[in-house]
Curated annotation (Swiss-Prot):
GO process annotations (BP): regulation of transcription by RNA polymerase II
Coiled coil: 27-89
Annotated source species: Kluyveromyces lactis (strain ATCC 8585 / CBS 2359 / DSM 70799 / NBRC 1267 / NRRL Y-1140 / WM37) (Yeast)
Designated gene of the protein: MED8
Protein known as: Mediator of RNA polymerase II transcription subunit 8
Protein family per UniProt: Belongs to the Mediator complex subunit 8 family.
Record-level GO cellular component terms: core mediator complex; mediator complex
Amino acid sequence: MTDTPSNTDPLQSAIAPDFSSVPTQALDALRMKFSQLTASLSKIRDEMSRAELPQWYTLQAQLTVTLSQLSSLTNTLDHYEETLDATVAYPLPSFPTTAHEGLITTLMRKKNIPEVDEWIKDAKETNGLDVDSLSDAEIKKLINKDKDITSWATKCLLDERAKHSYTGLYTTKERQTESIDDRDNLYTSSVSNVKTSRPFSVDKVLKFVNQGESY
């Protein structure tokens, strides 16, 4: 004889989760970026909490890595912006909402924390744009225009820099006493046509800092 099944609550029964609609690629990429950034920030906090402060070059190197990780995280968020905006998170019926009410409230939070609101307000005031009266398309157009102007200014600066030489420490009197041939060699162009290869890529450096793996 078989046992008759007892009446069970369908909400408490085992439910096979369906992950087909979960943006696993975006979430996994963000998880890795957040993990790297969190580890770097924790390291900086620990170093600054010591009685003896670290050397400035050590702190500068760690800060450079942290800024690179922050930039990489920002690019990843921008890349998956549409996917994340269309994603709706919700707890499964089996989640213990009563025991972990604080955790679920934090995870499902929609409103920004006060610090984030201050960052957004400061960014809006700094860029000088009236975001309330402009549409998203107009704001993106202005941002792209600013990027174009920045690229143009950078190119002009590099072109102007290539016209001058900043090598050598000769005074005007010393240059005047030199022969023409020697004077021609005093200031050679500081722009080299030789393309130097980068010994390490940014991804390899960040992976080494985070995981300690050598190559």
